[in-house]
Each structure stands twice: as structure tokens, then as C-alpha cells.
Amino acid sequence: MEIEKTNRMNALFEFYAALLTDKQMNYIELYYADDYSLAEIAEEFGVSRQAVYDNIKRTEKILEDYEMKLHMYSDYIVRSQILEEIAEKYPKDSFLQEQIATLSSIDNRD
């Protein structure tokens, strides 16, 4: 469960990071992407572990709320699955394969 939550938070962060404050971005990135402990983050920012914990929990809720409203991550997953199914079903259709590659590159650009 913990790995699944970490993967989900990292994915939601990729989609919605620009909507977070700098502090929220820093805490979430350090905690989930860089695997810092609450104590390490607290020391880095000169705050209590409880303050870091509270901020991370609030930010997790914010990220989940964004996903509930905007569906960017879930739509990306569905879109990727559909493109994969089409690519597997029509492997010899070069035009279709090119279009799938184009759509995939749009989804995966920064």
C-alpha cells in the first residue's frame, strides 16, 4: 500500500505541482520523490516534524481534490491504455502507429 501511495502522490505531483505553493512543492517532493523523513525535512526548513506532517497531509488532500475535479491523471492512464490496445491490435498500420506515437509524445512532454 505504501509504495502504491508513493507512486500515486508522485504522479499527482507531476500533473498538479504548478498549482501548489513553493513550500507544498518542496515538502512533497522531498518526502515522496527524494524519500526524506519528516525529521530531515523539518531540519532543512527549521520547523517542527508536526508542521511538516500537517503540511504534507494537507497537500496530499489538495492533490487528490485537484484530481477529483480535473481528472488529468486518470484520463492520462485511460488514454495510455487505449493507445496501447490500438497499437497492439493494428501493428502493421504505419499511419496509425505514427499517430499513436504523436499522441504519446504529447502526453509525455514536459
Curated annotation (Swiss-Prot):
Coiled-coil blocks: none
Pfam (any one): UPF0122
InterPro entries found in the cross-reference section: RNA_pol_sigma_r3/r4-like, UPF0122, UPF0122_fam_protein, WH-like_DNA-bd_sf
NCBIfam families from the UniProt entry: PRK00118.1-1, PRK00118.1-4, PRK00118.1-6, YlxM
Function (record text): Might take part in the signal recognition particle (SRP) pathway. This is inferred from the conservation of its genetic proximity to ftsY/ffh. May be a regulatory protein.
Similarity field: Belongs to the UPF0122 family.
Name of the featured protein: UPF0122 protein SGO_1122
